[in-house]
């Protein structure tokens, strides 16, 4: 398939995990990919797998960083067709242990960064009739124990998607999100490498395992494609069925 031939796609948090997997999928389908992250070495490694990929090392949580990303993309390719807001951090802590610096960092990158990137890319997306895909989380659909800042940020992302999707009548820009659960990434290594904790997680996931990054990246590519042309304002769980449960334990 070449669903993205000639399309310019920005992916934040592209140095590893879901972002890197999505970037490779877009590259396989003919896209002109702009890889964004804070660590150039990681981005360069991903770029080796994607012909013609551009690398921009910048912080999406700052206005200067966002300006460099959007200006660099326009200079290289002349437009923006898809924005994938994937950058994110997580610093687990309960209320009494949540420090202000950790709270501010999480909200700045996970939520303010989404706003800044989307606002800066918006005129170009309107011009191209493009779309935005966010990486939210099942943690944006409900609460987790000891994940206050992350839950707040991802809940904000999910509602940002729904509110912005309502502007499609004037903008022509579709806005959607994926909501992964446990995924085999660097950020989730503390979960998937802890046999006891991961075992508890697998008991709650009907498909019995964490997702591979490629399984989430493939859904991002679907939402960004013409195949999803009438999909707007959706928070699509990619969680193996975790969110299908109402929380009750098995009764049989």
Where are these regions (language model features)?
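Active-site helix of classical SDR
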Residues: 118, 153
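Residue(s) in the substrate-gating loop at a strand-loop-helix junction
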Residues: 137
């Amino acid at each position: 398939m070449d669903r993205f031939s000639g399309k310019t796609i920005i992916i934040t948090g592209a140095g590893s995990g879901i972002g890197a997997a999505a970037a490779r999928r877009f590259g396989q389908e003919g896209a002109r990919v702009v890889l964004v992250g804070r660590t150039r070495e990681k981005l360069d490694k991903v770029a080796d797998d994607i012909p013609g990929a551009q690398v921009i090392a910048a912080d999406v949580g700052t206005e200067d960083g966002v300006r460099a990303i959007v200006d660099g993309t326009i200079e290289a390719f002349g437009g923006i067709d898809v924005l994938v807001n994937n950058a994110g951090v997580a610093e687990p802590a309960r209320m009494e242990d949540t420090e202000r610096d950790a709270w501010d960092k999480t909200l700045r990158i996970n939520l303010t960064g989404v706003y800044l990137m989307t606002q800066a890319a918006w005129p170009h997306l309107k011009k191209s009739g493009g779309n935005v895909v966010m990486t939210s989380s099942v943690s944006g659909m409900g609460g987790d124990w000891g994940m206050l800042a992350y839950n707040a940020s991802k809940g904000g992302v999910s509602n940002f998607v729904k509110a912005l999707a309502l502007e499609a009548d004037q903008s022509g820009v579709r806005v959607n999100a994926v909501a992964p659960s446990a995924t085999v990434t660097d950020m989730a290594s503390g979960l998937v490498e802890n046999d006891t904790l991961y075992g508890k997680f697998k008991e709650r996931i009907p498909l019995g395992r964490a997702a591979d990054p490629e399984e989430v990246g493939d859904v991002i590519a679907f939402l960004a494609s013409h195949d999803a042309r009438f999909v707007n304002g959706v928070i699509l769980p990619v969680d193996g069925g975790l969110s299908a449960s109402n929380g009750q334990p098995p009764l049989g």
